[in-house]
């Protein structure tokens, strides 16, 4: 079985309202060029392309087909798509290399979240029989989750504000993030609720954006990248889709995926947590101690483009290895309501 590594990553600037169309082409073309130039590759070198996006954001069926224009319609390429975050497209690309069907693969995710009312669009992923007809929006569900944790003594509003303050401070060095001036915990707690107990800083901003990651196998990875980020564990698990049948203050699927992937050795963890309390849940589920640097990029709280933010977390985790800032890192992505489905990718450097 071939070893597989991340050799390139690029992310479009996170924007609250991009002038780009919903097919993502305007966001993808620049970052395709950026990542291919950085790795010394051309489009012809890529043996497999896989995208992650959603027709629900674009408002039309098979909307991802238009995004292929960013690759180029001719000559034909081997291409696939997942109606998921681009992190799951990366998983498919990883399997393609492991199966020996490609040496180099490129995964990308994109989403124009501002095209509709995102918190209502996400209600369409709920149980269609009992929950979705009530139209509880994504922020309201997250607020219920946060309140359950507070009442159970698992965390406090102060803990949540501390996550927001740290994320804002970390994002200052990330030129692609939506950066707000960092405030103190006390200042954040003095702000009004948007959905009790959530304040604006507890919620990831509605974001338009895209991300791309290039994988290569074995000797090709070593030849193309001075310090590849080798994938040593890649797992995803899912909890019940029924909100009433699981403990929303925990994320068992994240813990299971982390243990299977070997998350315990991570020095840096990039977690896809769209709400402050969800970062706290994930840190507990993945058993991340205080010695682990969590979301040094600022995380999803400083830019959460739908269907690209999870892939970007893996990209930032890989960047920490490729730059020499860490030996072992963890990238995480989530999907579904209240951390229902979770994916963990562990990356490390090798001599």
Language model regions located:
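Short acidic capping loops at alpha-helix termini that bridge into adjacent secondary structure
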Residues: 42-48, 158, 264-267, 290-291
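Loop/turn elements at helix/coil->beta-strand transitions in domains of secreted/extracellular proteins
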Residues: 2-5, 47, 101-102
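Short, well-ordered, mixed-charge alpha-helical segments that flank or form enzyme active sites
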Residues: 113-117, 169-174, 338-339
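Claisen-condensing/thiolase-fold acyl-transfer catalytic domains that form or cleave C-C bonds
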Residues: 22-25, 29-30, 53-106, 110-111, ...
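N-terminal leader/propeptide and maturation segments of large enzyme subunits in energy/redox metabolism
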Residues: 136-184
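Flexible glycine-/small-residue-enriched beta->alpha junction loops
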Residues: 105-153
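Short, conserved active-site entrance elements at the starts or edges of catalytic domains
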Residues: 185-191
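Generic N-terminal amphipathic, Lys/Arg-enriched alpha-helix
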Residues: 3-19
């Amino acid at each position: 079985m071939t070893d597989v590594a991340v050799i390139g990553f690029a992310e479009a600037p996170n924007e609250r309202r991009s002038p780009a169309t919903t097919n993502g082409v305007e966001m993808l073309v620049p970052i395709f060029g950026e990542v291919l130039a950085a790795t010394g590759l051309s489009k012809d070198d890529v043996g497999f392309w896989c995208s992650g996006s959603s027709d629900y954001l674009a408002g039309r069926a098979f909307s991802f087909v238009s995004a292929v224009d960013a690759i180029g319609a001719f000559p034909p390429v081997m291409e696939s798509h997942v109606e998921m975050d681009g992190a799951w497209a990366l998983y498919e690309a990883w399997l393609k290399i492991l199966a020996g069907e490609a040496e180099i693969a490129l995964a990308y995710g994109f989403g124009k979240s501002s095209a509709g009312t995102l918190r209502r669009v996400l209600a369409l992923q709920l149980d269609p029989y009992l929950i979705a007809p009530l139209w509880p929006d994504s922020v309201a569900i997250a607020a219920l989750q946060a309140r359950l944790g507070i009442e159970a003594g698992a965390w406090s509003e102060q803990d949540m504000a501390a996550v927001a303050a740290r994320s804002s401070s970390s994002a200052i060095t990330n030129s692609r993030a939506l950066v707000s001036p960092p405030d103190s915990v006390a200042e954040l707690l003095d702000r009004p609720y948007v959905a009790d107990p959530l304040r604006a800083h507890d919620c990831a901003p509605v974001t338009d954006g895209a991300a791309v990651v290039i994988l290569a196998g074995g000797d090709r990875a070593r030849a193309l990248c001075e310090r590849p980020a080798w994938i040593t564990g890649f797992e995803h698990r899912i909890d019940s889709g029924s909100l009433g049948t699981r403990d929303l203050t925990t994320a068992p699927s994240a813990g299971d995926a982390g243990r299977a992937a070997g998350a315990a050795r991570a020095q840096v963890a990039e977690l896809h947590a769209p709400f402050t309390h969800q970062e706290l849940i994930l840190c507990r589920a993945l058993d991340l101690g205080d010695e682990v640097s969590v979301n040094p990029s600022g995380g999803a709280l400083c830019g959460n483009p739908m269907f690209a933010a999870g892939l970007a977390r893996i990209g930032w985790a890989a960047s920490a290895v490729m730059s020499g800032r860490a030996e072992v890192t963890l990238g995480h992505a989530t999907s579904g309501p209240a951390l229902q489905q979770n994916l963990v990718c562990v990356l490390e450097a090798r001599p």
